[in-house]
Amino acid sequence: MAQKMKIVYVDMDNVLVNFQSGIDSITEEERESFKDDLDDVPVIFSKMKPVEGAIEAYQELTRHFEVYILSTAPWNNPSAWPDKLLWVKKYLGGLAYKRLILSHNKHLD
């Protein structure tokens, strides 16, 4: 019988996704308007790029572990949830998309 792989949870923000790249892509007006809550800028998550080396590191982890992506999204940004889902599809593909968990509880065991 094959040994079951251990489960690993990986965060998105500043682990897989370079949050700063999204901030760098918004206008000055948006920065000022959302200065206290930049993650509430509409479609900001769709503008983010991967952290350098993160895609390769994720792929390496999938060779040794059952990898799930565990992230949260702000309640006040209705585009954040679908944008995170589309980001995973775009950069990590089908299996990762099926292993994405969006929750406000990031302390899952």
Descriptions of predicted regions:
Residues 1-48:
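Active-site neighborhood of HAD-like aspartate-dependent phosphohydrolases
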Residues 7, 97-109:
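Conserved Lys-Pro-Asp/Glu-containing loop-to-beta segment of HAD-superfamily phosphomonoesterases
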Residues 10, 48, 70-72, 103-104:
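Short His-Asn-centered micro-motif
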Residues 20-21, 73, 106:
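Short, flexible active-site-adjacent loop segments at beta-strand->alpha-helix junctions, enriched
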Residues 23-25, 76, 109:
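Flexible, glycine-rich phosphate/dinucleotide-binding loops
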Residues 49, 54-88:
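Substrate-recognition element of Asp-dependent hydrolases with the DxDx(T/V) motif
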Residues 86-101:
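Structural recognition of alpha->loop->beta junctions
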